[in-house]
Curated annotation (Swiss-Prot):
Hydrolase as UniProt keyword: no
Organism ancestry: Bacteria, Bacillati, Actinomycetota, Actinomycetes, Kitasatosporales
Subcellular locations according to the entry: Cytoplasm
UniProt signal peptide: none
Stretches the record annotates as Disordered: 131-159
Organism this protein belongs to: Streptomyces coelicolor (strain ATCC BAA-471 / A3(2) / M145)
Record's GO cellular component terms: cytosol
Keywords of this entry: Cytoplasm, RNA-binding
Top-level taxon: Bacteria
Summary of the function given for this chain in its UniProt record: Required for rescue of stalled ribosomes mediated by trans-translation. Binds to transfer-messenger RNA (tmRNA), required for stable association of tmRNA with ribosomes. tmRNA and SmpB together mimic tRNA shape, replacing the anticodon stem-loop with SmpB. tmRNA is encoded by the ssrA gene; the 2 termini fold to resemble tRNA(Ala) and it encodes a 'tag peptide', a short internal open reading frame. During trans-translation Ala-aminoacylated tmRNA acts like a tRNA, entering the A-site of stalled ribosomes, displacing the stalled mRNA.
Primary localization class, coarse: cytoplasm
NCBIfam families: PRK05422.1, smpB
InterPro entries documented for this protein: SmpB, SsrA-bd_prot, SsrA-bd_prot_CS
Gene from which the chain derives: smpB
Record-given protein name: SsrA-binding protein
Length: 159
C-alpha cells in the first residue's frame, strides 16, 4: 500500500471547542496496535469523552473509543484502552506546567492520518462557564448577521 500524502481526518471533537476555551494546540503521534490502525483507516473513532493525562514524563490519551476491527481475531485491541502519545520532552514539560494551573486541562481536538501516520491534535484548554458559552454563541450570530447584510448590500449594488 502506497503512503498517503496530506491529512485525512478521522474524528473531530466539536464539543471540546464549545465547552473549552482553547489556549494552545499541539500535534502528537500515537502508539497503536495493528488492529487499531486498521479500524482507524475505516474511519471509526470517537473523541467525545477523551482527555490527556500526564504521568511522569509521558502523555497518555484516555477514554478515546476506537472500536474493535471487524476482521480481527483474538489479537484485537480493547476499544477504550489508554494510548501513549508521542511528544517532545519540551512539549510535555510545557503542558505539565501549564496544566497544573487551576481550571486548565488537556483535551483531544482531532484524530487524523498525516502522511500515513496516525496523529492527534491536543489542546491546552480552560473550561468555559455557561455565560461564556452564550456570549460566544451571541458573537457568532452577530458576525453571521453582519455578513448577511454586507452580502445583501453588495447584491443590490450589482443589480
Amino acid at each position: 500500500m502506497a503512503k498517503e500524502k496530506g491529512r485525512k481526518l478521522i474524528a473531530q471533537n466539536k464539543k471540546a471547542r464549545h465547552d473549552y476555551q482553547i489556549l494552545d494546540t499541539y500535534e502528537a503521534g500515537l502508539v497503536l496496535s495493528g488492529t487499531e490502525v486498521k479500524s482507524l483507516r475505516q474511519g471509526r473513532a470517537s473523541l467525545a469523552d477523551g482527555f490527556v493525562q500526564l504521568d511522569g514524563h509521558e502523555a497518555w490519551l484516555h477514554n478515546v473509543h476506537v472500536p474493535e476491527y471487524s476482521q480481527g481475531t483474538w489479537t484485537n485491541h480493547s476499544a477504550r484502552r489508554k494510548r501513549k502519545l508521542l511528544l517532545h520532552r519540551v512539549e510535555i514539560d510545557k503542558l505539565e506546567s501549564k496544566s497544573q494551573e487551576t481550571g486548565h486541562t488537556i483535551v483531544p481536538l482531532a484524530l487524523y492520518f498525516k502522511d500515513g501516520r496516525a496523529k492527534v491534535e491536543i489542546a491546552l484548554a480552560r473550561g468555559k462557564k455557561e455565560y461564556d458559552k452564550r456570549q460566544t454563541l451571541r458573537e457568532k450570530q452577530d458576525r453571521r448577521e453582519a455578513e448577511r447584510t454586507i452580502s445583501a448590500i453588495k447584491r443590490k449594488q450589482r443589480a
